[in-house]
Amino acid sequence: MIIGIGIDIIELNRIEKMLDGKLKFMERILTENERNVAMELKGSRLTEFVAGRFAAKEAYSKAVGTGIGKEVSFLDIEVKNDERGKPILITSTEHIVHLSISHSKEFAVAQVVLESSSR
């Protein structure tokens, strides 16, 4: 059973501006594992990567109904890719998490669907 849905869209140029102070912003948004991946990227690919993770984490927080804040922080959520490149959201929830991330020339968008783990 679906118990939550969240979606977030972010302008890539907004993230690009925040990446000027690259390390501080990335430390606030990305886990250590995500930062390690990000450090290997440059230019528009770095912007897309960070924007996609930002949108995914915001979408997850909306799906659980709290938003980013006291109960859920950016660092409580990690996005990895499986062996085929599919984004996987890692968090402490018991629920099944479905994540989709997409980019265009100007935007990154992510959608999260939370499903009850009991059938």
From Swiss-Prot:
GO terms for biological process: fatty acid biosynthetic process; lysine biosynthetic process via aminoadipic acid. Keywords: Cytoplasm, Fatty acid biosynthesis, Fatty acid metabolism, Lipid biosynthesis, Lipid metabolism, Magnesium, Metal-binding, Transferase. It catalyses: apo-[ACP] + CoA = holo-[ACP] + adenosine 3',5'-bisphosphate + H(+). SUPFAM superfamilies: 4'-phosphopantetheinyl transferase. It is found in: Cytoplasm. InterPro entries: 4-PPantetheinyl_Trfase_dom (IPR008278), 4-PPantetheinyl_Trfase_dom_sf (IPR037143), ACPS (IPR002582), P-Pant_transferase_sf (IPR050559), Ppantetheine-prot_Trfase_dom (IPR004568). Its EC number is 2.7.8.7. GO terms for cellular component: cytosol. Mg(2+) binds at D8, E58. Its main location: cytoplasm. GO terms for molecular function: holo-[acyl-carrier-protein] synthase activity; magnesium ion binding. The keyword Lipid biosynthesis applies. Its cofactor is Mg(2+). NCBIfam families: acpS (TIGR00516), pantethn_trn (TIGR00556). Transfers the 4'-phosphopantetheine moiety from coenzyme A to a Ser of acyl-carrier-protein. Belongs to the P-Pant transferase superfamily. AcpS family. PANTHER family: L-AMINOADIPATE-SEMIALDEHYDE DEHYDROGENASE-PHOSPHOPANTETHEINYL TRANSFERASE, PHOSPHOPANTETHEINE TRANSFERASE. This is Holo-[acyl-carrier-protein] synthase. It comes from Bacillus cereus (strain B4264).
